[in-house]
Structures are given as C-alpha cells and as structure tokens.
C-alpha cells in the first residue's frame, strides 16, 4: 500500500519557494541591481531603461557642450592675438604720424605694419577647431547640440561666423599703409574700428561661452536628478535586502527541518504497516 505524504509535499513546495527567494535575494545583493531580471519588476525595468537612455544622452550632450566651449576658447584665443597685433598697429601708426620720423624710418615701420596686416589675415583664415573653420568665409554656421532632442531653439546653440566677426579683409585694414605721414593719419580711425570690431567679437564669443557653460550646468543638474530617480527604481537597499535574505534563509532552514521530520514520520508509519 502506497501512502501519500501530504505534509512532505507541502514542505517541498514551500522549500522550493523559499529557495527561490534566497536565490533571488542573493543575486540582487551580489549584483547591486534590484531588477536583475525583467520578471522581477517589468514596469520598473521599462522606466529604468528609459531613464538610463536619457542619462547616456545627457552625458553626451554635456560632452558636446564642453567641446563647444573648447571651440569657442580657441576662437577667443585667436582674437586675443589679433587684438594685440591691432594695438601694435596703432602704435606704429602713431609713431609714423610724428614728424620726428624720417622717410626711411617710416618705410621700416610700414614694413612691420604690412607684415602684421598679413599675419592678422592669415591667423583668422587659418583658425580651425578639429578641421572646422572659425572665422573665414568657409566657416559659416556651426550648431552646438547641447540638448537631447531635436528642438532647434531648445537643444542647439548656433555659432555664426558672420555675426561674430567681419571678414578677415576688413579686419586686416585692406590697403592701409603708414609709409607717409598722411597715410599714417588716415589709418588711425580704421585701426580703432578694427580694434573695436575685434573687441566686440571677443565679447560675443565670451557671452556665447557663458551661455554654453550655463547650459552644461543645467544638463548636469538634470542628470543628477534623473540619476537619483533611476537609482531609486533600480538599485537595491542593502540593509533591507540583507534582512530579507536572512529571513528567507531562516525560512529555508526551518522548511528543511520540517521536510525532514515529515519524511521521518512517513517512514515510521510505513514500518508500522
């Protein structure tokens, strides 16, 4: 006669559940991930994955912003050099305007003057960042993608060379010369205009850099907030999980003892029969 040990069957079922709980909590504790498998929390996993995608996008947007700042700083550095050369042009023009200068001295001063003009045009035309022209006519517009979406106003900042600086030819003073006193007088105002234009361009770049840096700070604040939200959904609470694991192990141990007792009782009954 075969006996059905209902108590043993119940104990085995409960032991299986307890073992599953222990395994699940152990995996979570080892991985640090509350949703180690999608079955643990399907909705939470979907939200967490979406947040993680946004977080990675925000990281890239912040890198874009940092690269944009670097590009602006390169341009500002070039304009700083041009500004210094403009100041030297003004010195030479004033020196050549003075009657203490003879024709030969003016010719020597004009040689430096012309070379500075050539260098200004060259440095503006050669200014590049990662192969992108900054100030010459080929530069055009550059979009700084500092957002994670496709909104032209909200997610991009446009660098427009034509709005930042006039052409290199204009800044370079064209055919200006200080070979004579009269010519020296004529270039004084154009040099002042050139210096003012470069100063204005530097101010434009400075304000643009400040804007991009502000956007970058906003990105990181949003990143921190969304990271905290994602962490609450996905990450485990070690204290709570450790307590749950301990409880599950205690249940598992007690169920094993119960199962052993149920099996022993079943064997004793079989012996009596």
Question: PLM ranges: what are they?
Answer:
Residues 1-10, 20, 34-37, 49, ...:
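Amphipathic alpha-helical coiled-coil/heptad-repeat segments
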Residues 224-225:
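C-terminal catalytic core of tyrosine-transesterase DNA break-rejoin enzymes
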